[in-house]
Amino acid sequence: MAVLNQMSVLDMIKAFRRNWRAHCNSERTTLCGPDSMLLALQLSMAENNKQHHGEFTVCLSDVLLTWKYFLHEKLNLPIENMKVVDHYEDIRKTYDDFLKNSNTLDLIDVYKKCSIMTSNCEKHMISSIQLRDFLSGTECAVNDENNPHSPASPVKCSQNDKQVRLLAKKIFLSYLSLLVNSKNDLALAQILNTPDRGLGREAFTNLKHAAREKQLSMFLMATSFIRTLELGGKGYAPPPSDPLWAHVKGLSAFVNFIDKLNEILGEVPNPSLAGGRILSAIRTQLIKGHSSGEPFYKAVEEVVQDLNLRIKNIINSQEGVTVSATNISPVPPKSFAINHDTAYCGRDAVKILLVLLDEDAASAPTRNKAELLYNDQSTAPHGGASVLTLFRSPTQVKSTPVKPLRERIHTSLQAEKNKQMRQTLIRSQFACTYKDDCIMSKSKWNVNSSSKPLSALRLENDVSEGAQPSVGKARLETSSENVHVDRSKDDKGPRKSTKRKLAKSKQPGVREDIHCDQGDELYQPKNVKILKVPSDSHRKAGGKLAPGARGNRCTTKDKLIPGQTKLTRFFML
């Protein structure tokens, strides 16, 4: 019964291929078998969980429950008393978008399209219930229970060899599927790093996000990136920040190998010879680095022989149909083949590969769903990560961890200290005259400015400074004139003062009682009485000269910036 339904599914696919122009837009549209449908549904559920719960994962029980509901819902079968997971509509939409972007159709879509276009002579096509039983694997389970020849305890070694052979077959068919349909991301996920090209989960993640950003398939994104590097030149090269730069070597090897297969497909006119050369090229890549005694090497050899035989059988069967139907042209005219997805000489080989892939899509589903969906490196080192693990790879967010409070306070204090040190170091050559402790606060001016005139305010300030000179003022005069406390250097004061008096006597326009710049300070009236300063204020702070001991030069000086008058007098000499 299972074999009968499998043949019915294959007949349905053949009817679809005969009228492909009415069903799809491209001749190279590939079909998803039961296993590929289940994998696509799993990825859709994981994507939905990531959007709603933030984690790209899904448990096996939810996948099987949704798979059962999905088959009944899409085949328009009764779904009473059937459980369904949350957000099923979003899952279904994600599933349909994934197949559409991959240029693929599942068997249920093929069944619906063929049901609309089926003629009266083809009413013997498979029913919806039979297709449901075939996709769910119910018939296979019943057939195994009724088969008395199945061993009760299979040998472990033979089971491992069988798994390796199935893996090798999957790799070959994935290469052929990507060769026919370059948009098939599911096939690319299974062969991107087979054999090892250094394209692990990180490379797959970067390629996936780059493809989504530019709305391309993953293989077309990789091809575009490599072609830009090879043919675009420096002006068209991707930016250095592109994450694909780290995987240039592996992506270049993968794209060049697919180009080599496409060259064989387009240059060899004989479909049988072209198929054999393509399989031989894939075989050479897979067995590189393996000895002839390894199970994987033997499995690859067996798969190559089996696929070569199947290709020859397909060609022979098509030739027999062509001879029997003499009124149908075996090959469309050359003008029709132009601009139909491939060159004319390679179109026959593409048709043969499509038939080979359709036969695989009509094969029975895998009984062990857990091994199909969640098997990571079961046949290491050839199996690699599962499809869910590859698509789960998230974008790594570079976030700095939060530092402890003690460390943050220490960092801020250290930064403030360094800032103050930089401010004190960057000074001019006259920085000795700019002292923070000598600058008068603004509050002192604001309190008395409203009640007293400016001239009286200046006189009071001069008298107060002359009567009670501060230590800061003495320190200012000492630092500005480079005079130290020791008495040996204190004797040089009169010499400097006499030189300044001689210099002032040569300038008739400058008065002794007013030493200021007329552009910066107000003119002082002549009738202002200058208050005398006590003589005991001339010696303060260890014998230093007080400001009032300099011949009353600073008594009428306008208080601007300390040292400005001295600098002005220096440049007037």
Curated annotation (Swiss-Prot):
The keyword Nucleus applies. InterPro entries: P-loop_NTPase, PARPBP. It comes from the Eukaryota. It is found in: Cytoplasm; Nucleus. Residues 495-504 have a biased composition (Basic residues). Belongs to the PARI family. Required to suppress inappropriate homologous recombination, thereby playing a central role DNA repair and in the maintenance of genomic stability. Antagonizes homologous recombination by interfering with the formation of the RAD51-DNA homologous recombination structure. Positively regulate the poly(ADP-ribosyl)ation activity of PARP1; however such function may be indirect. Binds single-strand DNA and poly(A) homopolymers. This is PCNA-interacting partner.
